[in-house]
C-alpha cells in the first residue's frame, strides 16, 4: 500500500464516520460508498447526510456527494472526502482500492468479499475473519470493543444497546408500526420521559406518537419523511443532559473502532 492509494469505506453512518474521520485525519485518501436512502439517526456526525444535502461537515472534515470518479478526484484535491451512491459496490473494481472497510453495520454481510481489495476489514458481526474478509473489528461495547479479530467473528448481535449513563435498551427508540416518520423534536433537544419526539403517519392519515422512555438529550433522530417499518430504529436519547455537545461529536465507541482500523491500515502501509 502507498500513501496516495484509495481507502474505500462502505457505509457513512456515525460509526463509519468515526473511521472515515480517523483515516482522513491521518492524511489518507478515503472514498465512501453509501446507500441511496441512508437511515442514520446520529445525522449530525454521519457523512451519509451528504446523500441528501450534497455535503456534510463532521468535526472539521468536509464530505461532498459526487457522481463520478472524476468528481471524486476534485474533492480529494481540495482535501475533502467524496461520497458516492453505490449500495452494491459496483464501482469497486473501477476504483481498485488498496484497502476496503465494510462499515455498513448491517449485522450481516451485504456482499463484501476478500477479493475486493488487497486488505479487507469489516466492522462488527456478520463476517468471519479469513473467510469473508481479512480482519474483523469488534463493535460491541465492553472490554472487547475495538479488538482486532484475525480468526473467527465478532460477538453476535444481542439486540440490546450498550449502557450509557446507566441506561441501555431504554435509550434507543424503535418504530411500533409502519408509516412515514414525522419529526416533532430536533437533534440536541432536551426531552422528558414520555415526551413525543416524532409521529408515524400511516396511509390513512393517522399519526401515532413516538415517545421517549427516559429523560435526556435527543442525540439521534431519523430524517423527517423516512418510511419506517415496525422495529425500525428511529431515535437515541443520551441521559447525560450536561453533555449536549455529544450530539455533534464522534462518539467514544466510534473512535475506539476507528483506532483499530487505522492500526491495521498503517501496519499494511509500513510493510
Regions found by a protein language model. Give the residues of each.
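Well-ordered secondary-structure scaffolds
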Residues: 1-271
Amino acid at each position: 500500500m502507498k500513501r496516495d492509494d484509495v481507502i474505500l469505506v462502505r457505509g457513512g453512518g456515525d460509526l463509519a464516520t468515526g473511521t472515515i474521520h480517523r483515516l482522513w485525519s491521518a492524511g489518507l485518501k478515503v472514498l465512501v460508498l453509501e446507500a441511496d436512502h441512508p437511515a442514520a439517526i446520529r445525522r449530525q456526525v454521519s457523512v451519509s447526510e451528504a446523500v441528501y444535502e450534497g455535503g456534510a461537515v463532521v468535526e472539521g472534515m468536509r464530505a461532498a456527494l459526487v457522481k463520478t470518479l472524476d468528481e471524486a478526484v476534485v474533492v480529494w484535491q481540495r482535501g475533502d472526502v467524496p461520497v458516492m451512491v453505490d449500495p452494491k459496490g459496483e464501482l469497486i473494481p473501477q476504483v481498485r482500492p488498496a484497502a476496503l472497510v465494510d462499515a455498513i453495520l448491517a449485522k450481516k454481510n451485504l456482499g463484501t468479499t476478500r477479493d475486493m481489495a488487497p486488505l479487507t476489514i469489516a466492522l462488527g458481526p456478520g463476517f468471519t475473519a479469513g473467510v469473508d474478509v481479512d480482519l474483523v473489528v469488534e463493535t460491541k461495547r465492553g472490554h472487547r470493543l475495538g479488538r482486532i479479530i484475525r480468526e473467527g467473528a465478532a460477538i453476535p448481535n444481542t439486540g440490546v444497546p450498550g449502557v450509557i449513563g446507566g441506561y441501555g435498551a431504554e435509550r434507543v427508540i424503535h418504530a411500533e408500526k409502519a408509516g412515514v416518520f414525522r419529526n416533532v423534536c430536533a437533534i440536541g433537544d432536551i426531552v422528558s420521559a414520555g415526551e413525543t419526539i416524532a409521529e408515524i403517519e400511516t396511509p390513512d392519515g393517522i399519526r401515532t406518537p413516538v415517545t421517549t422512555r427516559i429523560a435526556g438529550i435527543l442525540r439521534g433522530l431519523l430524517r423527517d419523511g423516512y418510511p419506517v417499518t415496525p422495529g425500525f430504529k428511529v431515535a437515541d436519547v443520551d441521559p447525560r443532559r450536561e453533555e449536549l455537545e455529544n450530539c455533534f461529536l464522534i462518539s467514544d465507541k466510534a473512535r475506539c473502532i476507528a483506532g483499530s482500523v487505522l492500526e491495521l491500515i498503517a501496519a499494511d502501509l509500513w510493510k
